[in-house]
């Protein structure tokens, strides 16, 4: 069965490896990839191990119907680390990225220190001419997990009834 919508948050805070030929050969991303001009191609050489987060991306895409939507949380470093380029290529080829949401560093703190981005894409659809982008400056809590509230500029005090969380505003935009 395939899904219309899939939301994913791969376990990227830990270095969990998948090993074993039987498991790995199920995944294109468990093979070595060769860089070519403006692209990457899969080789026939299977790796000895791969991180679960990379395989999570591929499995998420395979579980979607054509035209299905994937919302996936990824570490920001994934987008600029040279060793992840082939994975980024795999994820973006033949798919339409509709949104990129930059999350605040405190999003998963105090339990995880990773700075994250959410990608929303449509499977097997041509890339539209633009990608919607949003930056959430606050997520409703600080680095220790304590709630933070919006500042009331008129009263010059903290509004104790409204969490400072930009995500609901961004979700309104995504849904429209």
Roles of regions detected by a PLM:
Residues 1:
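S-adenosyl-L-methionine
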Residues 4-176:
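A conserved structural/catalytic subdomain of Rossmann-like adenosyl-cofactor enzymes
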